[in-house]
Structure formats: structure tokens, C-alpha cells
Amino acid sequence: MKTKMIAVAALAAVAAQAEFKIDRTAMSEEYWKIWNDDVQKKIDADIEKYRKADGVFALDGVPDGAEVQVEQETHAFFFGAHIFNYGQLGKKEWNDRYKELYGTLFNSATVAFYWRTLEPYPYAPRFAERYEDTENFWNSCPQPKEQPHWRRPAVDPVIDFLRGRGCRIHGHPLVWGNSSWQRPTWIWDSFCPESEKRALEERTGVRIPSANWRLPVGVRDFELGGEWNAAWNKVYKMLSEEEIAALVPTYIKAYNYFLEKRIRDIGERYGSRVDSWDVVNESATDYHRWQDEKAVRGTPCQKSVYGLMPGDYTYKGFQWAAKYMPKTAWLNLNDYNMAPYFFKQAKDLEANGCRVDVVGSQMHLFNPAESVNIALGKGPEHLRPEGIAARFELLSNAGKPIHLSEITITAPDMSPKGQMIQAIIMRNCYRAWFSVEKMNGITWWNVVDDCGAPGEPSISGLFTRDMRPKTAYFAMDDLINGEWKTKTVAKAAGGKVSFRGFRGRYRLTWKDKDGKEQTKLAAVK
């Protein structure tokens, strides 16, 4: 308890010290011409229209004209971040400060369910915490990035922590073809008979690579992903899906079996405790390139950019998720590919009986040079006001709420100006995204510098590696806990109070006719 109080006090003190103020000189005149006053007024108007609502509440014993203190406690909108570094930062002080963000800055968290590291061996998922998942292990670990479960904490303690903090929980992902991060190597290595592997090689001259079992689980052959994809691409040119399936039927049967089993096991353990799922991640390219833009083709296997996948794997993923998850859990289709065929895929899945509740969109600004270009007014179209509007107008055609599920905005460098550039880009983009009618949540990706995946920028966090807040943290906190939180005084009339505020839970406080303070919790919806 004492440590928690220290962490809370530390964050509060930091926030008090550095109230965010925009330094417009960090950006060029060209940038501010793009994000001009008219643009900002339009964003403000849309936020007022789409993110706020009117509330009218009856108050027992309130005198006419009495002042009612109106204070928002929680948001209905989801402001999230992944929590992949839970307990892994190397010092208790850093871990405590990291944990304190969930339930204060973030009311939602994305929890890692990546198959490869969640189930490094068949029938042995890493749900429960073991010693290797504890802070003691990570605090004494000299090279954390070399550990196979870096950024992949055991699920049970993370779920318990988030529920205790009152956070919404989002699971990511159930189905994904990615051969470096998701597909367990043991499905091919252990459940495809050698006779089938030889038959495929004899027919095509292509040897599908296996994992190097001399290396530790999770570390072994990270480059295998590229080799795996390249080998299957050669096979695709020679054989149809039906011909491939005839050569490796046991593998395809095993993949289908273990994929359904995975979703069933996760649903049985976490279905009632997780609010939403990225059921299928990044499958739009396959839908367009290999499926002829048909959600259901009936083929036994699926040629995929990720290597061979089960036939109709996106459709099956949603069918299994609907079967094993409660109806209260949202089922999301998530992708970085915002081509028109992405929202077409969502509609096609629905037309074939799948429940798709939310569409997820990613936006990663990984290159520090791009942040410099944006500051100069030369940035990519999709991060300009008109580009943001066009992108989400298109995605809104799916007719679903939108979860901006993975956001990266890197600083160009760690100078004060570089940090301010990151903060201003983030602030303007968040405001524009928050103003989109169908947006229901925004999830920042890497909270801490130098804690991302290989290839991701080391300075894209809101905090430094030793958990010192960056300018972008103050800018985000200023939006979520300042500009976008309603705190006002309203006058009672006729035993009621009315006001307009951001959707969420409120505490209403007033004095009755005897001068006694009264409170009521109310929700603006």
C-alpha cells in the first residue's frame, strides 16, 4: 500500500510540475496552416456533437437554485494502451509508475494473447504466473530483450491487475497468420508427418523450413518467418490449394484443431473477464489477394501472405469466437490495411453469418524522419485533417464502431524540441480522431521508450526507459484528464439538475434543505 501511494504521489507531482503548454515554434508555419483555426473549430464542434450528451437527473431533497457540483469520474470513450511490459521494466519504482497509469491515464488496456509465446509447447499455455514472469526475475535479468517472453507477460496476473484497477480489457489477437509473432512452429514441426513433408518436397522441390530446436523457445529462428513465407510462395506458384491440401492433410487438420482449441481454451478461462477481442488480425490482404474478396470459399487450405493457413481462416475465427465467447464480448476485425476491401471484408463476413461488432484500424508512425517532415508541413496525407476525415469516412461505411487499436507516433529525437514535436502531432491527431462520430476508442501502443518490438522506434513512448515522463505524456494527460473531462456547477430546478458533458460516470454533490451534503452517481450516455 505504501509503495502504491508513493507511485500515485509521484505521478501527481509530475503532472502538477509540468502542465502542458504548446510551443508553436516547434512546428513550421506550413504545419500550422494545415492545422489552422478553422480546422480546430471544426474538430471542437464535432467533439461537442459526438462525444458529449445532455444529462437530466432527479436529486432527492435538492432545493431550487441549489448549486450542484458536477464532476466526471470516468470516460465512456476508451483511452487505452497495451500492457505488454507489465512487471518487466527492471526496477520496482519503474514498474509501480507504469502500473499506476492504468486506471488514471488509461481506462482500457490491450493484453497480449500472441499464440507463439502464449503456448510455446502444445497443450501448455502460459496462463498462470511462474517465477520467470515475476518482477524478481525481471529485476535481476541483465538482458531482458533476449528472453523469449519479453513483452509477453503471463495472462492471469495482468487480467487480475486490470480488473482491480477498473480497466476495460481488450485481448489481442486470437487469429493471426504472422509466422514470426503468432504461428507456433510446433504445428508444422511436430504434427505434420515426415512422409507428408517429403511428399510436398518431392512434388515441388521446395523444403519448408523447421525451427532450430537447439535455440530457446521464442528466440529460435526469428528469421524463420521470412524463410517460411518465401518457401510457401514458391509452392503457391506450382500447386493449387486443393493439391497442397492433398499432400499435407494431417498438417491442415492439426492447424484447424489447435486453432479452435486455442479459442475454446481462452474463451473458457477469460471469456467473462475480457471485454473485447481482436478476433482476426491483419487478414484484409489475404481477403483481397488470395480469396477473390470472398469471405467463404470452401477451400481446404488458404494461400496466405503468411504462409499456408487453414481454409477460410478469418470466417472460422469469427465463428469459433462467437461460439466460445459470451455475447457481451465485442468481436473485432483488426487491420492496418485501410483499402476499401477491408470494410468490404467486414460486410462480407456478416453476410455469411459472422458477428463483427467493431472494426479496428492501426496507425504506426515509426520513422523519426517522418515526424520531422510532419513538423515541416510535409507529412503523409493520412495524418492531415482532410486525410483523417477521408480515411474514417471510408471505414465508417462498414457501419460499425471504430477502434483505433494501435497508435505509434515517434519523436524525431529526445531534445526538448523533438519531444514537443511528438506531443503536438499526438495532440492534434488525437483531437481529430476523438471527433470522428463512430470512433469508440484509441489505443496508444508502446508506453515506454525502448520497449517495443524489433524494428519499432526506441523513442516512441510517453515515458523514457527509466519511466521519466516525456512531453507527450503531459499533452495526453491534458486532453484525457483535462480538456475532455467535464467539471462544472449547475443549478437545481424542480428537484432535478441538467447539464451537458462528456459521456461517462459522474459524481453529483449538493446540500439538501438542512444543509447536509448529498451525493449521487450518475451516467451520461
Question: What residue spans do the PLM features occupy?
Answer:
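Beta-strand-rich domain onsets/edges
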Residues: 19-88, 108, 121, 127-128, ...
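Distinct, well-ordered alpha-helical segments
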Residues: 68, 89-95, 183, 288-292, ...
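Substrate-binding cleft/loops of secretory-pathway carbohydrate-active enzymes
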Residues: 332-362, 421, 452
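Short Pro-Gly-centered beta-turn/loop motif in secreted/extracellular proteins
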Residues: 91-105, 498-507
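Aromatic-lined substrate-binding rim segments of carbohydrate-active enzymes
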Residues: 102-106, 111-241, 246, 258, ...
